[in-house]
Amino acid sequence: MAKKLEITLTRSLIGRPSDQRVTVNTLGLRKLHQTVVQEDNAAIRGMVNKVKHLITVNEIDA
């Protein structure tokens, strides 16, 4: 089975630099406490690492 990441936006984007806002939007997160499921690959991991202070991440088998 392929691994996937369950990503939830837990902190607000107010006052954050524009590159962090763009990264969160690229992950598919628009609203606070919204959760999305993304493939576990190097590109997604890089984006998660960039905004790890704003999100929570869980690995799931899907």
From Swiss-Prot:
GO cellular component, one term: cytosolic large ribosomal subunit
CDD domains reported for this sequence: Ribosomal_L30
Top-level division of the source organism's lineage: Bacteria
Leader peptide range in chain numbering: none
GO biological process terms on file: translation
Gene3D superfamilies from the UniProt entry: Ribosomal protein L30, ferredoxin-like fold domain
GO molecular function terms listed in the Swiss-Prot or TrEMBL record: structural constituent of ribosome
Pfam families: Ribosomal_L30
UniProt entry keywords in alphabetical sequence: Ribonucleoprotein, Ribosomal protein
Family from the record: Belongs to the universal ribosomal protein uL30 family.
Assembly: Part of the 50S ribosomal subunit.
Record protein name field: Large ribosomal subunit protein uL30
